[in-house]
Regions:
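Short basic (Lys/Arg) and small-residue
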Residues: 25
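GHKL/Histidine-kinase-like ATPase module
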Residues: 115, 122-124, 130, 134-227
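Short, well-ordered strand-loop elements centered on a beta-strand within folded domains, enriched
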Residues: 4, 73-74, 81-86, 203-211
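Single conserved hydrophobic/aromatic residue that forms the stacking wall/gate
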Residues: 1-6, 10, 227-228
């Protein structure tokens, strides 16, 4: 509608989902943040399907949200909500907790592999310097806690990957590269961090990550990074 004083008014007839945002995200595909530069500055994902797929493949999933002094709760069974999101108490905390049980009807094994989780948590801690990640395994008789925190970020990541490899030395036996080379920059809203180090090996190992997702086959992101470097 065009109004006086050069104003324009736009109104749609969107019916709304008639359910909480939490339930929409957990039960509908493509409900993610897409390409928002703030939401996806460091997080992975693209099509908004991740957590809704986890829910769909779970026999049971519980979602707890601590926000604005309240604790919210909603429970799902086989991907469907058992009841709407509700307030179950007060909370001084902030954040979200998801507890899920994979479906035995879909997966041949629903046992989690701690070694895979440890490797992934370590990667995330390296890629997000300063963040602390705790992995607590109480599935066994004796509880085991692994803590990951690396203030050096990708620079420390390269040192970790290189620590057991043969060093490149001169004829006097001195290491030629005691520290990894570190490069960082920002161009056109794209941030780049790079660390590299030479050793005595004859082939390179490249570990490219985009928004914390390992791209083992390289691709455009790696190519553009090498061009800018």
């Amino acid at each position: 509608r065009l109004r006086r004083q050069r104003q324009m008014c736009i109104r749609d007839s969107h019916k709304g989902e008639k359910k909480s945002a939490a339930e929409v995200i957990m039960t509908q595909l493509h409900a993610g943040g897409k390409f928002d530069h703030n939401s996806y500055k460091v997080s992975g994902g693209l099509h908004g399907v991740g957590v809704s797929v986890v829910n769909a493949l779970s026999e049971k999933l519980e979602l707890e949200i601590n926000r604005d002094g309240k604790k919210y709760f909603i429970e799902f069974k086989n991907g469907e909500s058992k009841s709407p999101l509700k307030v179950i108490g007060k909370s001084k905390n902030s954040g979200t907790q998801i507890t899920f049980l994979p479906s035995k009807e879909i997966f041949s094994s629903i046992k989690f592999n701690p070694n895979i989780l440890i490797k992934r948590m370590r990667e995330l801690a390296f890629l997000n310097k300063g963040i602390k990640i705790l992995l607590v395994d109480d599935s066994q008789k004796k509880e085991k806690t692994s803590e990951f925190k690396y203030d050096g970020g990708v620079l420390e990541f390269v040192e970790f990957l290189d620590e057991k490899r043969e060093k490149l030395q001169n004829k006097n036996g001195n290491d030629l590269f005691k520290k990894a080379v570190y490069i960082e920059g920002n161009k056109n809203n794209i941030e780049l961090e790079c660390a590299l180090k030479w050793n005595a090996g004859y082939s390179e190992d490249i570990f490219p990550y985009t928004n914390n997702i390992h791209q083992k086959d390289g691709g455009t992101h790696l190519l553009l990074s090498l061009i800018h470097i």
